[in-house]
Amino acid sequence: MNIAKPNSYRSGPDERGHFGIFGGRFVAETLMPLILDLEKAYTAAKADPAFQAEMNGYLKNYVGRPSPLYFAERLTEHLGGAKIYLKREELNHTGSHKVNNVLGQIMLARRMGKKRIIAETGAGQHGVATATLCARFGLECVVYMGAVDVERQQPNVIRMEMLGAKVVPVQSGTRTLKDAMNEALRDWVTNVHNTFYCIGTVAGPHPYPTLVRDFQSIIGNETKAQMQEVEGRLPDSLVACIGGGSNAMGLFHPFLDDPSVEIFGVEAAGHGLTQLHAASIAGGRPGVLHGNRTYLLMDADGQIQDAHSISAGLDYPGIGPEHSWLHEIGRVNYLSATDDEALAAFQLLSKLEGIIPALEPAHAIAKVMELAPKRAKDHLMVVNLSGRGDKDVPQVGDILRGKSK
């Protein structure tokens, strides 16, 4: 599809929350006043220096930002091409990028006088970050999690409960992230007066994709400054994994108007693109889910199909609407990595750098293993290491033991 190139790739969405034909707000009438309230509160907070100052204080002293930009010397040497830097989001409090967004949303919820917070979670990282901030600010916390994910992410379930959250296993549908999001939306419709829905990715009805992106953009803004400091210039390429796509959008957005920077998003190809996978752009088409129009995995009748990934955090049949738009206008290249490729990358990074990545960013590392060797030695490549692998060690251990039998 030929779409006219915009003057800026960073000016979206429009006032109705659209990025081209994507995005928007497709919600029940009951939720419309809440969504409009949220948008109003967010616009006011953005313009309020006190809100920004308070948030920056927590980002520094509670989350532990800025996160380091680390030169992966042995990985670079091993692959024999581009100079690889890791943006170390896994060193944040709670172990992933999720806390950047949750902090912003919980501060908004407090500003709006909401005392009960609900969230959906796949890998459990967004749930843990939400439970953590609710504990810090003394708010009630309910986390919806697909029953399948509850099984495969036990360490995070225990963490959430220790932090005082109520974890609700969702038994409907495929019992994964999509179903958890459905349940959270149902809860929100029922409890509109006192409840704030803290969405974990750049999806959902407007203004969520925008506010989550803005809270996550600290990743790309820091990377820009850090790269300038160590290399004196912009990176040549960026790589990040994509489920809904908030860690990727956080890294990408500040660089969208820098034409010299090549950008790669990596979806989960599961068992392969002709079999079960979670690659909405590679294997999907535009449709409406969870309040926005975006690329989705659908059958011929438009029914949402099951997504599959070894990684619970990428196991979603859609993608953030801004990613769909960036794909259609050609600013970002969307690739995919299979379960097996991610497993190999998980092991490689652990052994070469002493960093055990989450299975989600292991998908990004898998594509770096392909991209880096084809690039010159002075090519600067930044990978978003969006989460740590503690939560995945039991699962990966079982898989590897099974394979060695």
From Swiss-Prot:
Leader peptide range in chain numbering: none
Lineage start: Bacteria, Pseudomonadati, Pseudomonadota, Alphaproteobacteria, Hyphomicrobiales
Enzyme Commission number(s): 4.2.1.20
Annotated source species: Bradyrhizobium diazoefficiens (strain JCM 10833 / BCRC 13528 / IAM 13628 / NBRC 14792 / USDA 110)
Protein name: Tryptophan synthase beta chain
Entry-linked InterPro entries: Trp_synth_b_CS (IPR006653), Trp_synth_beta (IPR006654), Trp_synth_beta/beta-like (IPR023026), TrpB-like_PALP (IPR001926), TrpB-like_PALP_sf (IPR036052)
Alphabetically ordered keywords of this record: Amino-acid biosynthesis, Aromatic amino acid biosynthesis, Lyase, Pyridoxal phosphate, Tryptophan biosynthesis
Pathway the protein acts in: Amino-acid biosynthesis; L-tryptophan biosynthesis; L-tryptophan from chorismate: step 5/5
CDD domains hit by this protein: Trp-synth_B (cd06446)
Reaction(s) catalysed (UniProt annotation): (1S,2R)-1-C-(indol-3-yl)glycerol 3-phosphate + L-serine = D-glyceraldehyde 3-phosphate + L-tryptophan + H2O
